[in-house]
Amino acid sequence: MDLHTAVYNAAHDGKLPLLQKLLASRGREELEELLGEVAGGGTPLLIAARRGHLDVVEYLVDHCGASVEASGSVHFDGETIEGAPPLWAASAAGHLAVVRSLLHRGASVNRTTCTNSTPLRAACFNGHLDVVRCLVGEHKADLEVANRHGHTCLMISCYKGHREIARYLLERGAQVNRRSAKGNTALHDCAESGSLEILQLLLSCHARMERDGYGMTPLLAASITGHTNIVEYLIQEQPSHEQLSGTELPGEGSSQMAGNHCSTPEDAEQYESCCPTSREAAVEALELLGATYVDKKRDLLGALKHWRRAMELRHQGGGFLPKPEPQQLVLAYDYSREVTTPQELEALITDPDEMRMQALLIRERILGPSHPDTSYYIRYRGAVYADSGNFERCIRLWKYALDMQQNNLEPLSPMTASSFLSFAELFSYVLQDHSAKGNLGMQLDFADLIGVLSKGVREVERALQLPKEPDDSAQFTKAIAIILHLLYLLEKVECTPRQEHLKHQTVYRLLKCAPRGKNGFTPLHMAVDKETTNVGQYHVGVFPSLQVVKVLLDCGADPDSRDFDNNSPLHIAAQNNCPAIMDALIEAGAHMDATNTFKKTAYELLDSKLLAKSTVQPFNYVTLQCLAARALDRNKVPYKGFIPEELEAFIQLH
């Protein structure tokens, strides 16, 4: 073990005598080196603060000159936090003495991590009230510094259910109606976490029932998460605003909560009148809650109970509230339509499958197609059908969800990528199942495969039409890889000449938009790379794939295309030791003696320990022109401007 690691481990374990021994008599430069980051990104001071070793922290700062602001990587609950200062780590872990010590030694109370999380947010997240009081009450920490998502300390306290911290932040003037980047408020966080007491507290402070970026109110947020207590509280009969006009606000004269004009949860019912729940909102909340009971809680009787209440509210005094007429019935939902009468509702009890379709219909109507939960539960229901062997029903639902995602989400959305991968895994399983069972297994339809492949190409086209290149190159690479896996599976399905033509048209669309994955890989590079095999948890296709390579070449893929290291697909095939694929590339016109950035030919990259070299004979493909080009390059003979441009490009190829 080297000295650097030994110092880190001693700080981690709180072994001050050992640490003093290791660092004694060290010069300033050597101390700076030893107190710097280790391989994992942490520092001795950071890990000592994380572990709560006060004596080690003070020794490193006072006697070794460790910076109280030096940030690094630290682990919490299985997650790596990048750019965390020691004060953040101590606050997150709840080590009050270490927090006070670091602040006394000059640590910035509002110093953030790479995600803009403050020490105060870390303490709020983990419920350390004493640390929160220290940071805010003693050192004036800024309550309103939000993380990169616009999520504030009050919001995270509400979401995690830390009532006393939420109360304290409100007392200190936290903005109760602050909105995050996605438009949600602290009320939304309470509704999603099911914390009724904190929700009452927020309402007593005049929190408003706002809609977030998806059009969701806190009431609907409680419905989709299945928190019946929140839903019941918000839809219960409340006194009208006029009834309370002129009523003095309890606690209004209080010095601590005057900024928010709130007092205690017990007074919340008086203030609920500021945001009464309409009959229509209550109906939708109960209907959506019933859908949640079907799909999330798997409680069909509980769902019926909530749907009955919603139906009763629709028919109560004040005028009948009809459901909107559907524009068209959906094949994926088995052409089901929502029930509209109490009799139709009661008939559902004998048809569980129809109840599940009702849940999907209700969710799509209320949340709309752009809300992630809408497509998520359609995919969930499809997966349940697949598990029971009903692959056709699954494919219909998944195709409907995929269309919904592509029409409403940004290109390369993780949810859309997950849908494509699920299709590839399902198709692979169906093909294997049919191979094992013969006529008893489901026959995979060409139309289903080519339809999903075409949508995959469309996703790449959408991403490349953006004003700038895709932010996440890994996600873009994965999208191309999934398309290649779908093509791999399609090669296992018998095609008519017309279907073969349609397949080639789809592949041509992909090649025409010239997508580039990691390190500048073209689809042809990826088709000859074994790393393309790894796209998900389950096995789909195997790469390198000669069949996929041939299809790409037939559709016009350039066998001499280059990646960022000037490797051609032939180089990558050689690195993967695939002589059969190399032969196919050479027959398609790939130059055997073309060199990469490191002046290596594909033949030179073949594994000498294997027999592949004996099957590939480079001199069968090298021309005198190729040898002359390499001689010019090897001897540094100037040629630019003295020969035609076409010949210059040929020499540069070598």
Curated annotation (Swiss-Prot):
Keywords in alphabetical order: ANK repeat, Cytoplasm, Mitochondrion, Phosphoprotein, Repeat, TPR repeat, Ubl conjugation pathway
Keyword Phosphoprotein (UniProt): yes
Polar residues compositional bias, start-end: 253-263
Main location: mitochondrion
Positions of the UniProt region annotated as Disordered: 241-265
GO biological process, one term: regulation of ubiquitin-protein transferase activity
UniProt KW Cytoplasm keyword: yes
Extent of the TPR repeats: 283-317, 375-408
Residues in ANK repeats: 2-31, 40-70, 82-111, 115-145, 149-178, 182-211, 214-243, 519-561, 565-594
Pathway this chain belongs to: Protein modification; protein ubiquitination
Modification type Phosphoserine: residues: 108, 608
Taxonomy, superkingdom: Eukaryota
Membrane spanning stretches: none
Functional note: Substrate-recognition component of a Cul2-RING (CRL2) E3 ubiquitin-protein ligase complex of the DesCEND (destruction via C-end degrons) pathway, which recognizes a C-degron located at the extreme C terminus of target proteins, leading to their ubiquitination and degradation. The C-degron recognized by the DesCEND pathway is usually a motif of less than ten residues and can be present in full-length proteins, truncated proteins or proteolytically cleaved forms.
Family, similarity comment: Belongs to the fem-1 family.
Protein name: Protein fem-1 homolog A-like
Source species taxonomy: Eukaryota, Metazoa, Chordata, Craniata, Vertebrata
